[in-house]
Amino acid sequence: MESTKQKNYVLPIAMMFALFAMISFVTGLPQPFGAIVQNEFGASNFEATLGFFANFIAFAFMGIPAGMLLQKIGYKKTALIAIVVGFVGVGIQVLSSKMGFATYVAGAFVSGFSMCMLNTVVNPMLNTLGGGGKKGNQLIQMGGSLNSVSATIVPVLVGYLMGTVVEERTIAKALPALYIAMAIFAVAFLVLFIMNIPEPSLAKANNNAKNEHSPLAFRHFKLGALAIFVYVGIEVGIPHFAGLFMMTPEAGGGLAIDSTIAGSVVGTYWFLMLIGRLVGASLGGKFTSKAMLTVASGVGILFIILAFICPITTMVSMPVFKSDISFGVAQVPISIMFMALCGLCTSIMWGGIFNLAVEGLGKYTEAASGIFMVLVC
């Protein structure tokens, strides 16, 4: 009976994995599009990042409403609404090729609503389908692996469409990437519409039991919420500030490293996150989230300490992952290498923190997922 039940979960799990990949594909678009809007609209460095920030600021507005939607209408309907919103958001970005920069930012903001809602769905659903504990963590790590693969594809795809001539970088040339995103949304909607997925939130709601508390009444959830807020800052901050430090001229206190080398080092950080998630997925069924998180955090702290104490004048030959999907070697300060290695540690932290934070929350899991998304911004 148990094996039959598990088999029935194969398609829902596969669907959640697909949604996980969709999230990073759309979330990853603003980064390569930043260079495009700079060229086409004459945007400043700050304005070029507005698409990226608009995407994540949307999480602050949509996180709690998304959690409420989960409780009220369930996982499937919430995901379907999110897919429609995402389709519209990317569609608005398509129009920006004719309607200007503000339209592009608006499209990124609307897409952010969709990404927030999908994140609110996939994380608790995978954890629930795995029964929480080790299996729940393992499924989230596997979904995270696909998330990393998709995130790797986006800049490569957009870079291929753009070519090497800077003056030819326009949204019109990048439209195929946006059309692919819209097609993915359309296919995902049709597949999810005809698929049956478990609805734990609706089953709990049918009990007509009044929610006497909120997720914030649970100490371990509050600690998890704080941890996820700090984690997101670390995960994004390490490659961002390392890249900035490498490319800043020496007069400005930086290392004045060539942008191509700096980009390869940052790309290696994200590639190591993919490797770490694949390893985490394979080990998730054998080790507890607490054990994995403890080891990853400890090693990460060690790498950061080494990055601080090692002199930046000490150079090493570091294997790097290049934007053309090849490997090479770059001469970088040893402190930068230790920062890049942190990607192995940050890789499994999201799944581990979420798994531990929602453990035992029961009917409060959906609301907890929404609160988590607010803290992502």
Regions of interest found by a model, annotated:
Residues 99, 136-196:
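Helix-loop-helix hairpin linking two adjacent transmembrane segments in secondary transporters
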Residues 50-68, 267-279:
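Central cavity-lining transmembrane alpha-helices of secondary-active solute carriers
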Residues 105-145:
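Cytoplasmic helix-loop-helix junction between adjacent transmembrane helices
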Residues 30-31, 217-267:
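Extracytoplasmic gate region of multi-pass secondary transporters
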